[in-house]
Amino acid sequence: MAWRNPTSARQTPLYERSWVAMVALVAIFLAANFQLLTGEATEHWDGEQFFAPFFSYLASVVRSGHWLLWNPFSNAGSPDFVEPQIGALSPITLGFAAIAGPSAVAFRLYWLCLWLFGGIGMFVYARSLGAPVWGRFLAGLSFVFSGFYIGHGQHLSVIHSISFLPWIILRLDRALLTGRRAPALEAGALLGLSALAGNPAITISTGLFAGAYSAVRFFSSRASTIAGQVRPALETFALFGFVTAVVLSPTYFSFKYETVGYSDRSGPLTRECVVSSNGMQPVGLAAIVNPYGPGISRANAKDPRSPEVMSATYFGAAPLALAVLALALPGRRRWKWGMFFVGLLFLGFTLGTALPLRGWLYDLVPPTRYFRHPNMFRVFFIFSIIVLAVLASGKIEHWRRLGDAPEGVLRRFAIISAGLAALGISVITAFCFHYPRLGPYIETAVPHAVVVWLGLAAIAAGVSWRPAWLAHLPGALVVLTVGDLLCAHYLSADLAFNIGIGEPARSETKRSPVELGPENFARALVVGGNQQLFANKPVYCSYAALLNSLHMDSAEAGTLMAFATGEKRVWFSTDAVEAPVTAETLALLTKEGAARKAPVMLRHRRGTLLGETPPPPFNAEAIHNAPSAERVPFEVLTYRPNELSMKVECPEDGWVLITDRWSRSWRATVNGAETPIAGGNLFFRLLPVQAGENLIEMNFEPFLLWPLLTTSWTLLGLIGITAGLRAWQRAANRPPPPAPKLSTPPVPCGACS
């Protein structure tokens, strides 16, 4: 006989309280990553060479009371405020950097806080879907310990973007279901806020996923409900998109505006590059059921940073089984299958060249032409499957409280679990027989796969055999998933960080990041790992996102780089030959410079650099016959990131080449008269001068930055304050919980039917 569990007749047990589950989620996450805080584990790859140095530099600039706009230390100068992955215009990144400072511990704490923010968001979103406490816990745990977080743990901007995903969908879903405008505003503000310091690929993809999610909500809702009506749905999504565009505008408008003539990234990438660069291969789908697939791929790859390493997709055995069970259950079929097919669609984008989907997306959605790495789309598959698992947890909790489940449901769960167990064990077996090198953790990976998958099958079979054990199913799944994901984290942690090799080297300095002074005008050649950002030392070429392929080629050739480094890097010539900015020009310029031991002066009109006027024809004879440039006496008066002034002594009228990078927002005066800055020698600043002493003053003045930033932050503040006030009012008006009733004996289900 089934017995009803009278939960209303007693106080909620401690383990069924939401705050306890939340604390447990945070504690497990911190315990799994505690080595990052103690220094036993450190960032590596892009984390060590890009994100940590730039966070430290940004913190130093902010603490000095300035904005990071122009970075004079990297690549002979760079407009780094436009690079969203640095977060120079994000209130979150700036606030944390200002408070925590430029230390390595501060960077790792920021990293972990962002990472954990995603797990907490998934927990809260699962609650909005009606999940029980244990379902929320599983959702948060499986998301924050998923292979996507591990595979991209080195990429701080990716972690930043994806951790906002559940919060964005939470508020967007609320807006779609209620027709209220406030949640739509909040969803747009969250996506825009994430974009200010996030990865552009994830930002754009999140917008696509939000659109697909909204469509599923619309088509799976009855026409009598608000979510099923066309006009409210369109208004909600339009408001969401408008707020997003306003909030992210300081970074994204500036990126599109400032990078023209400076970086190759100002325009779309080629279709071939987008589709073929770091897409997941079909064999990578095995990572859905086994976390060690990327580890074995890494052990057998020539490059440890190969695309296979970034294909980690595992998020737990139990959540996957629950998701498949959700599809097999009656009720809300359009909603569940809609989410499933959206997940499959984004998984198809992940496969890159294996399917035509990513290419079609390139053709149909222009913003997707600006980023590569198709494997990043897999996070939306993970998210969709976890949503299905959340829905199944709600059903199981309902049956648990009733004391019984509909006939055949538990048998289905047992069959699903057994099938997935067979698949999971087959995958690890195939790994062992296929790959010659199995990696350092195979002795843990094999028992992990066997115990987890057979354990899941045994739990499901036991509940199917004895339905009375249904009351213990949530606890068993929670214990299994905690052990499963902690072991998976152990197997894959070295994809995200180094363990046990000590702190990476830092070229610390007492130099100011904003007051360079004449003594720091000298420029070095190349510094590995962006160490110049720790040392505040200008370099000609460094690792950065705002790439210019010709500039990188010039660094490899060496000749042009030699003329733009050292202390005496200001040149004069009576003539500057007009030439196009092409690889052919670079090759001839390098050849002439090597032969003459001095540069030839080339000029590039502003309109040509901006693509407003056609480039001049390449004239090799004119370049060959041009006079050699010469060094002239100069005195640096002011040298700051956004300001450079100097006196230059010129023998006659002509042109002065200052070997700091050209960018369209630099303004100049020569002897007090405003003078347009032309491009010189492909990358640098060229100014007309007169015979005698010339006072040259240059300032970096980004176009529309301050109006856009003021509007963005003001809108963020208004939406945030309004949301906070509403939350406070709801909490103040919430009725007190009812007094606990006296406990009563269990009542047979039949007596109440």
Where are these regions (language model features)?
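Soluble catalytic regions of membrane-associated enzymes that act on cell-envelope
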Residues: Y292-G293, N300-P307, S311, L322, ...
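Transmembrane helix irregularities
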Residues: I99, F145, Y149, G153, ...
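Active-site-proximal, structured, solvent-exposed surfaces of multi-pass membrane proteins
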Residues: L14, G348, P614-L742
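Transmembrane signal-anchor helices characteristic of membrane glycosylation enzymes that use polyprenol
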Residues: R17-E48, P53, F240-Y257, L345-G348, ...
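Transmembrane-helix signature of polytopic, membrane-embedded enzymes
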Residues: F123-V144, R181-A182
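Contiguous transmembrane helix-bundle modules in multi-pass membrane proteins
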Residues: W3-P6, L156-S163, A175-G188, G192, ...
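Membrane-interface coil-to-helix junctions
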Residues: W19, I28-M122, L141-S163, V260, ...
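Periplasmic/ER-lumenal interhelical loops and adjacent helix-loop junctions
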Residues: F51-V62, H66-W67, P91, V246-L327, ...
